[in-house]
């Protein structure tokens, strides 16, 4: 669909801008690899919302966007929290059933009383390949999505003035550490206000969805 096209075109633009570097440093590091792709999806969602007055369709667009945010920011972060707990539990001699209990507690903490979770969900962690093949990998999804949301918040405030710095960010590819690349575009990874901007984008989508009253 159009969102997938925007996502993949984002990767293409990122690669083109970074192509001046050697083959060893063209590809962005994991935390920045999804920057242009997810940013492209955000642009498409905003454009569709701007041209849509039907409340039902607006709700669908917002729900899809928020689903993606949850799946990429919260869910992936909780995978890593579970991994930390699981590795400690294994060192303490916990059985597989004990790991299942930890995972179910992990889900219950996420959803509290908003969802009824059946006992079968305790086995879900067994279906997540990253846990076996690339341990502690999933943090990068959370980092990348929240980075894009925070960048998008800045774009909303700055408009055209945002573009040169963003292009400069993508042009680095993987030629430097993420902290250095971001600092050269006036982004301080240690600044809570920058990251809070991403949560403000989420808040805005939730408030609009609630305001539709459907």
Task: Identify what each model region corresponds to.
Residues 1, 22, 53-58, 191-192, ...:
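Short, structured coil/loop segments at alpha-helix boundaries
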Residues 20-30, 61-68, 87, 91:
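Short beta-alpha connecting loops at secondary-structure transitions
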Residues 4-6, 13, 42, 50, ...:
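C-terminal, non-catalytic "cap/extension" segments appended to globular domains
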Residues 21-28, 49-61, 158-165:
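Short, glycine/acidic-rich hinge or "gate" loops at secondary-structure transitions
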Residues 29-57, 65-67, 71, 144:
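Post-HExxH zinc-binding segment in Zn-dependent metallohydrolases
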Residues 1, 25, 65-66, 136, ...:
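Non-transmembrane, amphipathic alpha-helical segments
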Residues 3-4, 15-38, 42:
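Post-HEXXH active-site segment of zinc metalloproteases
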């Amino acid at each position: 669909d159009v969102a997938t096209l925007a996502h993949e075109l984002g990767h293409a633009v990122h690669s083109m801008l970074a192509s001046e570097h050697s083959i060893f440093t063209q590809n962005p590091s994991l935390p920045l690899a999804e920057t242009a792709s997810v940013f492209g999806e955000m642009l498409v969602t905003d454009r569709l919302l701007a041209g849509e007055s039907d409340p039902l369709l607006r709700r669908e667009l917002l729900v899809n966007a928020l689903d993606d945010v949850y799946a990429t920011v919260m869910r992936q972060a909780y995978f890593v929290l579970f991994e930390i707990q699981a590795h400690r539990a294994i060192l303490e001699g916990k059985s597989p059933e004990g790991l299942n209990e930890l995972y179910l507690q992990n889900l219950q903490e996420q959803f509290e009383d908003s969802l009824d979770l059946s006992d079968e969900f305790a086995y879900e962690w067994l279906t997540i390949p990253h846990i076996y093949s690339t341990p502690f990998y999933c943090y990068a999804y959370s980092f990348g999505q929240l980075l894009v949301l925070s960048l998008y918040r800045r774009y909303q405030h700055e408009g055209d003035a945002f573009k040169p710095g963003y292009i400069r960010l993508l042009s680095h590819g993987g030629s430097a550490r993420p902290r250095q690349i971001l600092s050269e575009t006036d982004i301080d990874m240690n600044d809570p206000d920058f990251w809070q901007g991403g949560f403000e984008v989420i808040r805005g989508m939730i408030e609009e969805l609630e305001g539709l009253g459907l």
